[in-house]
UniProtKB/Swiss-Prot annotation:
GO molecular function: DNA binding; endonuclease activity
Record function comment: Involved in cell division and chromosome segregation.
Name this polypeptide is given: Probable cell division protein WhiA
PROSITE patterns: INTEIN_ENDONUCLEASE (PS50819)
DNA-binding region listed in the record: 280-313
């Protein structure tokens, strides 16, 4: 089961809600996955989904809150996946006109009916109604990627005005949803992991939220470990390169003028480095008598490298 299906399965269990919340939720579902059909003077409205839990919820809300016994039909998809497509149909005899009016989908102005692509403010004038509306929009046209791979949550709509209204509604909760056009659709999307967690909380997908949070924590831990390993590898590489460079400089001095020509403090460090090429500066310093700190050993080795460089260039 996809992560999207898990989220929808969880939030479709929210059936014990107020009539106002149910109205907000079904309005959002109808706006994002509904189609208005005309046959002569008769009109009907069809909601389409590939998710059986979503279809059951649409049917249940219409029956329990609006006393509408919609038709529930199933057909095979023409796509390669061959999934079932579920259609919830409300006809004129069932009261589709009244439903379209109360959900803010149809508006009658001067006796003329027209589609309203905006979100009716009366449907989302409380916190709970806003949450129910966003939940409905996700049930009807939302999806979320597998969080193991990437963080991406989106709502697909077919109206720019509606997409912008939905984005603004989501952002009243402090989120940063954005709108883009993709072919003939308008997408409201969120890509940041923490914001997706917040949206799952808003729509009531608490089990999915915990699963995503666990995945986020594990990914962050893996990233931190990788960064630490990379950092330690880089530091080790620098230390090894420095030791190799120091040994080469000391051997050059030994070849050209002999280590005996070096001052005692430099000669002692040079001899230790030749004997213990893999030891750290701290460990070399502890071998000296009296012991010398890491910075002191580093200072002496720099002087040795400077002498070697002067020998290479003939300036000694």
């Amino acid at each position: 089961m996809s992560f999207s299906a898990k989220v929808k399965g969880e939030i479709c269990r929210y059936i014990d809600i107020s009539k106002e919340e149910a109205l907000a939720q079904i309005s959002a579902i109808m706006k994002v996955c509904g189609t208005l059909a005309f046959s002569g003077r008769q009109i009907s409205f069809k909601m389409t989904t590939e998710n059986p839990a979503s279809a059951r919820l649409m049917f249940t809300i219409l029956k329990d809150y609006f006393d509408i016994h919609a038709k529930l039909m199933v057909k095979k998809s023409n796509s390669l996946k061959k999934n079932n497509i579920y259609m919830v149909v409300v006809t004129e005899e069932m009261g589709v006109k009244k439903l379209l009016e109360v959900t803010g989908i149809l508006r009658e102005i001067d006796g003329i009916m027209s589609l309203d692509y905006h979100i009716d403010e009366n449907l989302v004038d409380t916190e709970e109604k806003k949450k129910a509306y966003i939940r409905g929009a996700f049930i009807g046209g939302g999806s979320i990627s597998n969080p193991e791979k990437t963080y991406h949550l989106e709502f697909v709509t077919h109206s720019q005005e509606y997409a912008e209204d939905l984005g603004k509604l989501i952002n009243t909760f402090g989120l940063k949803a954005k709108v883009i056009q993709r072919k003939n659709s308008y997408i409201v999307y969120i890509k940041e992991g923490e914001q997706i967690v917040d949206l799952l909380n808003i729509i009531g997908a608490h089990t999915a939220l915990l699963e995503l949070e666990n995945i986020r924590i594990m990914k962050e831990m893996r990233n931190n470990v990788n960064r630490l390993v990379n950092c330690e590898t880089a530091n080790l590489s620098k230390t090894v390169n420095a030791a190799v460079r120091q040994v080469e400089s000391i051997k050059l001095i030994e070849r050209e003028i002999g280590l005996a020509r070096l001052p005692k403090n430099l000669r002692e460090v040079a001899e230790l480095r030749l004997t213990y090429p893999e030891e750290s500066l701290k460990e070399l310093g502890e071998m000296l008598e009296p012991p010398v700190g890491k910075s002191g050993v580093n200072h002496r080795l720099r002087k040795i490298e400077k002498i070697a460089e002067e020998l290479r260039t003939g300036n000694f």
